[in-house]
Amino acid sequence: MLHSQVPGSVLAVFAHPDDTESACGGTLARWAGAGAEITVVICCSGDKGSSDAKAKPAALIRRRAKEAAAAMGTLGLPTPVNLGHPDGSIDESLRRQIRGEVVELIRQRRAEVVLCPDPTAVLFGRHYVNHRDHRDVGWAALDAAAHEAGLPHYWPDRGAPHQASELWLAGTLEPDTWVDISDSLETKARALMCHESQLEEPGEWLRRMVERRAESDGKAAGVQYAEGFRRILLG
């Protein structure tokens, strides 16, 4: 189904500093341009996101935070909320903590739509295994949105209950909803190029990769370029 409605308030919860743009940057840029209030939450600091053995984690955290802020500005969004948890550290205790943090943000922002990674998506063909942080953050956000933020006895110290209407899972193997990003594809590509620490040679190859992925989703939706999601109705 091609989805054209624009929600009033959106909370996008992802693991690493560049995940949001990759998963749904075109959709968020389109929604922001139409007046949606959007908060992006980055759960992990990006402290391990480098193949350079000499890179210092503290410097990497600072650099990636600046890159994320620049990318959000490119999409027309405010500076993201950085929870600052170390990469690869999400055990059961920390996942519970993230649930509470997401519940509080859902309640504060009165989010209508919560966007997060699909935690059930693990193997993408023969060449990509979904990062564990993506899956762990997806489960935490899913549980917070579906079961906890709307009930008063969950996290009673984290604000008044609020039930989001919809949960959108990005990076999914089972898309059933698409957003036309034909007018925001270039914006998405420019946002991803802000993450220079993650790119060996920023340039045309990244734009082509973004275009190919969006073109594939676009064929499923009957438009030139799209992003696909698994949409769960909660309200």
Q: Where do the PLM segments sit?
A:
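Metal-dependent de-N-acetylase/amidase catalytic core
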Residues: 1-11, 92-235
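Active-site rim/loop-helix segments in enzyme catalytic domains that contact anionic ligands
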Residues: 1-109, 230
